[in-house]
Regions:
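Catalytic machinery of carbohydrate-active enzymes
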Residues: 1-354
């Protein structure tokens, strides 16, 4: 059997598909199991995964329609027998990709935006469930293949190499961070749709870091992120002592993971790095409530502390659903909702956690 797992939404969603990938291998040990991802960081997360044969990576949106179609058509030659669109790929583009690739069995969840056209693109469908985590929604597809749960437990899986672990240790040694208590912070969020609006304000992060440097000088703060966060990192670093706070300069997502693994605590909104922190079992994980957070995308299999947002107040599904669209609300409303989480609330949570 040849199976293709399509997981082309967020980078974190790739990580949320790893329990399904492991179950597929447990159920079909002799199958060829490949994955198709959108982002290079998604490929990084699946590199070295022993349950996969290959990982295909292509940004279909950036490639443009002709190039995207040519790429998907080239995958038809693989003659996959089954394709699985992992949760929560609500946009029709991903089901169209499955149809072009052409596996006879094409599995997907149905979403709020699911219609007659979608039923022409995929042929085995089950409803998504907002009361259950994305990992569990993914595992629900197994009976559609005549399969079931074979593993005694499930976890987000990332397989770092000894060289990557060594690199992280050398980074700490070179930056005089070995043996220090480390707090990782990710100031960013997804850049598609209007997901940048769920970021906690930069000014709040600046005030928080200054206060931590002043009142918790034993902590060493590492700022994680990619090119999109570079400007924010520079704004924070310009106001604080360099020996207490620094940028985690990594070349790829796997180095980021290896370095995050050394952290004692991690702070973010719901992002790919939030899911990565859960996968790495960082001892103290703190999540600021944003309008996209709901039961389906909490940190999976890992305890965390939520800094509650007085505006969102557990009503994430009123703001964001898997309907192919962005966060509901005006730019001003969403920015104000995130500004409503005070620096004092986050500092107090951090102080009690580390």
């Amino acid at each position: 059997m040849k199976i293709l797992v399509i997981t082309m939404a967020g980078i974190g969603d790739v990580l949320l598909a790893t329990p399904l990938i492991h179950e597929l291998r447990a159920n079909f040990p002799d199958a060829t199991i490949d994955a198709l991802v959108r982002w290079p960081a998604g490929r990084d997360l699946l590199d070295n995964n022993p349950h996969l044969n290959r990982v295909h990576q292509q940004d279909l949106v950036q490639a443009g329609k002709p190039a995207a179609l040519r790429y998907l058509w080239s995958l038809r030659s693989e003659r996959y027998e089954v394709s699985i669109n992992a949760h929560p790929q609500s946009q029709r583009l991903y089901r169209l990709a499955a149809r072009v690739i052409g596996a006879p069995v094409r599995i997907s969840h149905s979403y709020d935006c699911f219609g007659a056209v979608d039923r022409l693109l995929v042929n085995r469908v089950l409803p998504q469930d907002y009361t259950r985590h994305t990992v569990e929604n993914n595992l629900d597809v197994l009976p559609l293949l005549g399969a079931g749960l074979k593993l005694p437990a499930h976890a987000l899986e990332l397989f770092l190499t000894p060289d990557e672990e060594k690199w992280a240790d050398e980074f700490l040694a070179e930056n005089r961070l070995a043996g220090q208590k480390l707090l990782g912070i990710h100031v960013g969020s997804g850049g598609t749709k209007n997901l940048r609006l769920k970021r906690w304000p930069l000014g709040h992060y600046q005030e928080l870091v200054r206060r931590l440097n002043r009142e918790r000088p034993e902590l060493r703060i590492l700022l994680f992120g990619g090119p999109e966060e570079k400007q924010d990192h520079q704004a924070i670093l310009a106001q604080v002592p360099g020996e207490l706070t620094r940028e985690a300069k990594t070349r790829n997502f796997r180095q980021t993971a290896a370095l995050m693994k050394r952290c004692h605590a991690f702070l973010s909104v719901d992002t790919a790095l939030m899911h990565l922190a859960a996968a790495l079992k960082i001892p103290a994980q703190i999540v600021i409530e944003a309008p996209t957070l709901n039961v389906t995308n909490w940190p999976y299999g890992h305890s965390f502390t939520l800094v509650k947002n007085p505006v969102i107040n557990g009503r994430g599904l009123d703001y964001y659903r898997y309907d192919g669209g962005g966060i509901k609300g005006t730019r001003e409303e969403l920015l104000a909702s995130m500004a409503a989480v005070s620096v004092e609330d986050v500092y107090r949570t951090l102080r009690s956690s580390i």
